Amino acid sequence: MAILPLLLCLLPLAPASSPPQSATPSPCPRRCRCQTQSLPLSVLCPGAGLLFVPPSLDRRAAELRLADNFIASVRRRDLANMTGLLHLSLSRNTIRHVAAGAFADLRALRALHLDGNRLTSLGEGQLRGLVNLRHLILSNNQLAALAAGALDDCAETLEDLDLSYNNLEQLPWEALGRLGNVNTLGLDHNLLASVPAGAFSRLHKLARLDMTSNRLTTIPPDPLFSRLPLLARPRGSPASALVLAFGGNPLHCNCELVWLRRLAREDDLEACASPPALGGRYFWAVGEEEFVCEPPVVTHRSPPLAVPAGRPAALRCRAVGDPEPRVRWVSPQGRLLGNSSRARAFPNGTLELLVTEPGDGGIFTCIAANAAGEATAAVELTVGPPPPPQLANSTSCDPPRDGDPDALTPPSAASASAKVADTGPPTDRGVQVTEHGATAALVQWPDQRPIPGIRMYQIQYNSSADDILVYRMIPAESRSFLLTDLASGRTYDLCVLAVYEDSATGLTATRPVGCARFSTEPALRPCGAPHAPFLGGTMIIALGGVIVASVLVFIFVLLMRYKVHGGQPPGKAKIPAPVSSVCSQTNGALGPTPTPAPPAPEPAALRAHTVVQLDCEPWGPGHEPVGP
């Protein structure tokens, strides 16, 4: 009994003396190797043939390697709660889709490898939560688009960004300009055709920029490139020097690249692709004096143009130079014109006024400028009063003006000018419409020898029922054209125009050949086929008639057979009446005729046809009946 109090005193001390138990770790995924005995915890599954991220991952892991598998997507729950993960490798899988917020819990992640996959775009939410990311490797994908906010969460911490070997034609340069801590930027082997000026000006820590094998023809100067090592510097550039690689681009070696040529180096193999005189030459071997530009020269411009108010007008200006000049337009009031609700400026130098107003008239100035200078040209536009309103079936109009190659008669006037009634002589004998039927008409016009350089003819026509013009382009050697698919019983207004090249301006112009009016013949109303309901009723009636006739014939046959058998059913044979062997009788008294014995029943096969044979002798004068 003395031992019991002692045990009761020692019982509270038992838990304190037992060793502490740790939380049960998650089992290691199949085909993976897990290092859980020492920190940091690692889960290594390279080349394990995985089709998805294993669900039984140890959420305490600091390193997760899933490279060289067949993972097709990364879902939101795949990496949830892995707040201590530092390194994640998903290289060389088949990933096409990354769910928005898939990395949201990886706030401690330092390196993310997604190279060698099949990503086509990177949205704003796919990298959300990576606030400590330093290395982002996205090379060897199929990226064609990168959202402007895709790198917002890691913009201040990112040090290494690799976008090489993708299909990028454009980049969010504003977003890249905010990567203030980036040291290495890989943009090589993409489809970049241009880099905006100042794109790298804020990347003060950038040490390596790779733009090899893109489509760059020029590289604009940037303050960043002042840190490029000069040829006079000894080997071993200083730590602050920038390593720039831009070989494999079709560089256009003109005055725009003189700044780069002055930073001569001896360790790169860039070459010139154009102009032809410098094509194929080593970039650093071309002298600075050969990097020249040509000032712009205006080669074509629109002649003086007159249009009625309310109509559109197109002003054209063409210029050549090296580099290709940019064309701008200045209004008569001195304003620089651009795209607006009333005007559109095209890259080829065309200014289109959608709706002209009386105040738009005056001298428009075309300015062509490039790095070597600028050139100007004046184009006069006259805006007249608006034309009087005309109906689609109007028969009076002003004749087309001659000598104005760029003035195309308005559609309503062109379709009505020089119209020809179908029954009267044509007003314009240049165009004739013959052999017109219900849906076709033959258009003929004479040879236009006074107009040199005709490229083609244009036929435009519309019917009296609508204002929609239909156009047909005809080869220059043709003098006739058969119009088909016309509507019957309608009146058509038609005009033929010659399309030629104006030798004075070098622009394409049109000149009316003539117009005509004709009417198609009304279509004969064909005998319409019976309607489907009618055809169906006829078939039903015919089928019913056949059935009724068949029933009647069947009944008639039964009646005939019934009559032949004497009113007895054909299955029962008629019992023949007793037949006497007496052929005749006399008026004399005769003895009683003996009653013959009843005949034997006939065979069943002969019941239907009974044959009675009478064996009689001739009876007449001198003959007496034969007694029994």
Swiss-Prot record:
Post-translational modification: N-glycosylated.
Region listing for Disordered, in residue ranges: 382-430
Glycosylated residues in this chain: 81, 339, 348, 393, 462
TM helices/strands, residue ranges: 540-560
Database matches in PROSITE patterns: FN3 (PS50853), IG_LIKE (PS50835)
Residues of the Ig-like domain: 295-382
One GO term describing the cellular component: axon
LRR repeat locations: 60-83, 84-105, 108-129, 132-153, 157-178, 181-202, 205-226
Extracellular topological domain residue ranges: 17-539
Domain (Fibronectin type-III) ranges: 425-523
Stretch forming the signal peptide: 1-16
Sequence ranges assigned to domain LRRCT in this UniProt record: 249-295
Residues in the Cytoplasmic compartment per record: 561-628
Swiss-Prot/TrEMBL GO biological process terms: regulation of presynapse assembly; regulation of synaptic membrane adhesion; synaptic membrane adhesion
Segments forming domain LRRNT: 19-59
Compartments, as annotated in UniProt: Cell membrane; Cell projection, Axon; Cell projection, Dendrite; Synapse
Disulfide bonds: 317-366
Membrane topology, record value: Single-pass type I membrane protein
SMART domains for the chain: IG, IGc2, LRR_TYP, LRRCT
The entry's keywords: Cell adhesion, Cell membrane, Cell projection, Disulfide bond, Glycoprotein, Immunoglobulin domain, Leucine-rich repeat, Membrane, Postsynaptic cell membrane, Repeat, Signal, Synapse, Transmembrane, Transmembrane helix
Biased composition (Low complexity): 406-422
Comment, domains: Lacks a cytoplasmic PDZ-binding domain, which has been implicated in function of related Lrfn proteins.
Summary of subunit composition and partner proteins: Can form heteromeric complexes with LRFN1, LRFN2, LRFN4 and LRFN5. Able to form homomeric complexes across cell junctions, between adjacent cells. Does not interact with DLG4.
Protein role: Cell adhesion molecule that mediates homophilic cell-cell adhesion in a Ca(2+)-independent manner. Promotes neurite outgrowth in hippocampal neurons.
Family: Belongs to the LRFN family.
Protein name stated in the entry: Leucine-rich repeat and fibronectin type-III domain-containing protein 3
Gene this chain is encoded by: LRFN3
